[in-house]
Amino acid sequence: MGFTEKQEGLVKESWEVLKQDIPHSSLRFFSLILEIAPGAKNMFSFLRESEEIPQNNPKLKAHAVKVFKMTCESAIQLREKGEVVVADTTLKYLGTVHVKSGVKDPHFEVVKEALLRTIEEAIGEEKWNEEMKNAWGEAYDQLAEAIKAEMKNHHDETA
């Protein structure tokens, strides 16, 4: 079964709520990543030099927004096209950056957990449910698979 219109709607609806306080959501997202996997700190150039998560770091905010937006766009594409379609240049770049940063499969799960918890907190318990969690989870998983495939291509090209 493909990604449904309802799933797409759930992702879009919660994205609208998330967008209302991007600075807080971005900070929370990275706080959760480091809470789940403290060692991940060194994978982010904008966190390496800092003892704590920088409150007003534009790179941190920009990175979090990219993750949120790309996952939301993945949901829309999954319903419309049945797959995640990311521009080749963007995907190639994402693959290269993730390889250079030393990203492995388990890291994608850490980001997924942090993403889902950030969204849950942002929209509140009364709106968060299993359907919404599954919709965001599926959209993220498909995006992660596209990035992993490109990482493999990068490994194959440089091997």
From Swiss-Prot:
Phytoglobin that reduces nitrite to nitric oxide (NO) under anoxic conditions (e.g. during flooding or in waterlogged soil). May not function as an oxygen storage or transport protein. Has an unusually high affinity for O(2) through an hexacoordinate heme iron because of a very low dissociation constant. A motif (Homodimerization) lies at residues 35-39, 105-117. Heme b binds at residues 45, 59, 63, 98. InterPro entries: Globin, Globin-like_sf, Globin/Proto, Leghaemoglobin-like, Leghaemoglobin_Fe_BS. Belongs to the plant globin family. It comes from Gossypium hirsutum. It catalyses: Fe(III)-heme b-[protein] + nitric oxide + H2O = Fe(II)-heme b-[protein] + nitrite + 2 H(+). One of its GO terms (molecular function) is metal ion binding. Binds 1 heme group per subunit. Its EC number is 1.7.2.-. The record marks 133 as: Homodimerization. Keywords: Cytoplasm, Heme, Iron, Metal-binding, Nucleus, Oxidoreductase. It is an enzyme of class 1 (oxidoreductase). Pfam families: Globin (PF00042). Disulfide bonds: none annotated. This is Anaerobic nitrite reductase HB2. The gene is HB2. One of its GO terms (cellular component) is nucleus. PROSITE patterns: GLOBIN, PLANT_GLOBIN.
